[in-house]
């Protein structure tokens, strides 16, 4: 008799789990990337792109600097301020950060909102290495 509550709880858990819908796994798509040298070529060729820097303002103006013409929109604010980029919907947006991690996140956010975005591999560290 003292095991009866345990049996009831176990049965409830089993029945409850049987009724759960199977969660479909969403395939993880690879984030599109671009090499720094290819970004430099696009800039030199005056291709109509948007350089979007997703670092903080302090980093943007800091020792690593920023690419001339880049627009600053920190990744932490990207979702809330996404509408500010609507005029660039038809452009390729090259997303930049310090080393490529935050820009990968920013690229995914932009793609989820229908933008044509690519992550600049290596970020400003790689950019400065090629200068």
Residue ranges, per PLM feature:
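Active-site flanking residues adjacent to catalytic metal/cofactor-binding acidic residues
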Residues: 52
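Short, surface-exposed ligand- or partner-binding patches at beta-edge/loop junctions that are enriched
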Residues: 96
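Rhodanese-like catalytic fold shared by cysteine-dependent sulfurtransferases
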Residues: 2-8, 15-49, 57-92, 101-131
